[in-house]
Amino acid sequence: MTTTTTMAAAGADPRSAITPITCDTTGTREKALASLLEQIMDSYSVSDDEKPLADAVEAFLRSKPHLTVHRHGDTVVASTSLGRPRRVVLAGHLDTVPVIDNFPPRWLAPGDPLIREDVAAAHPGERVMWGRGATDMKASDAVFLYLAATLVDPQYDLTYVFYDHEEVAAEKNGLRKVAEAHPDWLAGDFALIGEPTDCGIEGGCNGTMRFDVVTHGVAAHSARAWMGENAIHKAADVLNRLNSYEPRTITVDGLDYREGLNATLISGGKGTNVIPDECRVHVNYRFAPDKTLPQAKTLMMGADAGAELGNGEHVATGGVFEGFGIEMKDESPSARPGMDAPMAVSLAKLVRERTGREPLAKLGWTDVARFSLLGVPAVNLGAGSPLLAHKHDEQIAESGWRPWPASWRTGSPAARERGSGARVGIRAIE
């Protein structure tokens, strides 16, 4: 592959099957990781188009005799069965958000104008992988695939989860479907989600809910406005309540979570000369993990409003939007950081030693919440900057993941580099 050239064949259908994934462990770890990243970056896997990549990941994992592999839809789960006293789950999603002129991917040589200034300053003289999914989260997926291939005798049993539909509505999420159909596949004592965190720990996550706040009026011709009631004008009170909301920062298990309540969409009206009889303000509430989902809903609409996903509009009986109609659109629980779990404490110590970084709160929602519901402590830890996720110039420097996989292997440096059969393990949870 030539630097600064695209990796996919010109004119090829990006949704077609990809070549088998391989991992050459005869060279350095860095070379193997770069090769794995190239291979999975070259697969177009926007949500709903993950199947070719899932097929290739499944075939790769089934070629490893130390792993037992299961598949549910386009989610692939591989695990060791060594009878170790504890099990760690490593999970990463295969899908990406839609491309924005950033596929096929490419390696950028030092000095290429497509390299961001902040990336060039942090990683001078390095190649940079540019393209959709580089940080969110194929760099972490590449690390997981490398570990799956090389950790043949880990200190603890391991489960690798590569799942689909993380970037879309919760009901399509592959991890959610596995948790419902095969929760035993996800059993463990600790879980790690490879969301981009610049190789630092981000604990837990804020919960999120989306709902329409609905105002009603009476339609009339705008020439005779007094014959109607303007629903859009009534929405002014909704906006006033949003403007008066003061975001709180809440400390949970030593980490600071900032909440937010914002209008993200507004719609109303059926014609330019018609007084609107309905207006909808779409609201997103991000709440700290000191609250359950029902408690968060109570703060927004009261304890007995009755608004649930799919059951239409209900009147808020209390909370911020008391008196207005509420129609739920999406909801996901928060997750406590779990930083008091023994494995989390050990991992935090290791990350601190290698990077100097202390754990932070995860302000966005991630699938750590699904593991929390299963009773499995989980944290976010992955390669790449979260600030570049979903951006048109998404990219990661070649050394952007090095602090991370190096943290997960033990044994002599020579054994680590050649990927030998020397006893290896997850040092962070010994």
Placement of each model-derived feature along the sequence:
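Phosphate-handling active-site elements
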Residues: P113-R127, L147-V161, D184-A187, L242-V252, ...
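Acidic/histidine-rich catalytic neighborhood of metal-dependent amide-processing enzymes
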Residues: M137-R210, R423
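Fold-independent oxyanion-binding glycine-rich loops
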Residues: H72-D74, G92-L94, D164-H165, G194-T197, ...
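Buried hydrophobic packing segments
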Residues: V57, D141-L151, L175-V178, A235-V238, ...
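Hydrophobic/aromatic beta-strand patches that form the interior of the parallel beta-sheet core
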Residues: V88-L90, V161, L192, P377-V379
